[in-house]
């Protein structure tokens, strides 16, 4: 016996052990050890667990101090009832049990591998997938939580561990697929990426988990974040209410998921991220920034695009309702700043209808793509000479400020045209009632418009048109004015017919006692006039500090307009 032990410890151990079958699944090793100690001292009792599910297989091995005790246990305990089952006690040295027995204990020459039995590379992915799928949800959640803590606390150690255990990295990726954290298609693309890290186990393409664990790990461990070969739609990532426990599960130590920018800058394509980035998406290993299909379209203002239809990709975003210059430091239209304004073609309930001052053939809901200076012209208020008939340009060449003719009234007419634009913008601002900055801007423009109207009424009184002090002022000035002061090129028809001395239909000067060009309807004081008067007073009371707080374009335009008003009022 001693010679046998020296010759082969495994055989000696098998002779001192018995195989115990038909064990109830709820039985513990301690309970079984108590039963088998009835025939003699028990050295150890080992229940055999399923490596994939972690559940007991229903059999185990009991080791005694000598072979005689083992034989006694087979005679006396075979058929012993335990928890409603008859235990089967047999010789552990039989061929059927020899392989299981060899894996028990440290005395055997075949030391149990910490990774379990050796599996062929072809079967490794399927085996890992089965093992992961058999885990209870609670255990899988706990595993992910522990892995997250491991990566957060010791990123380098976690990386080394996953590099040395590729099957663990593959299992973690598979678990993310099972938990619907990672889409299977994305997981496949991660596995089949080309990497420079040599794979430890080669895998054949099979099912969703078609690459071997070595392939999975070598990819997962890669610290690079290359983009996926083709753009993925947003629906490719599923969270389904899973907590962000995997946010850093394979971060830092594994392939840290690239933070996808949450803001889309400019009209160019950008990576799209829901709710602040993909990092909160439970850190898919090595995912990198995933270009979304919806990010391939130039990201122009959605509300403007909805009103005007899609613009060509090479057309810059129209600048906005404040008439921002193209170099507006805010980097966008007022729509993108406020987000609460009406669509571009909106005129408000008092005067709905399509704007009549657009180039024919262009969508009347907004300015043409090349018009970037100001918002759409609106129909004038009822104050502005409605009885004259259609508001299309009826003035002919004398009112085209580009020519510089008729120096007597061009300055006042250009300023009046700008005032009409301001009133149109004021109408939209009064309808929106949303943004303080826009309201203040509109008030300033309305104040300037009303000042111009009063000034023109004085200059166009019984004395007739008075030459402007500076001579002709082109009404097509584009400068930094916050409103479109006129039209250039194809927008010439945006000039609104207002007071002039001659050449207008039903709007000539109506005697010395009435300001020229005013229709009878304009002499009626409406609540809107009172409101505008209050706004004028507010703007006139703006201090230099308040004006200095405005954006550069608006501030400069206000100063220029004030200078113009002062020069006009100081004229003889």
Curated annotation (Swiss-Prot):
GO terms (BP aspect): mRNA 3'-end processing
CDD domains according to UniProt: RRM_CSTF2_CSTF2T (cd12671)
Cross-linked residues, Glycyl lysine isopeptide (Lys-Gly) (interchain with G-Cter in SUMO2): 189
Residue numbers carrying Phosphoserine: 14, 519
Extent of the Sequence repeats: 410-414, 415-419, 420-424, 425-429, 430-434, 435-439, 440-444, 445-449, 450-454, 455-459, 460-464
Interaction with RPO2TC1: annotated span: 509-572
Protein name: Cleavage stimulation factor subunit 2
Source species: Bos taurus
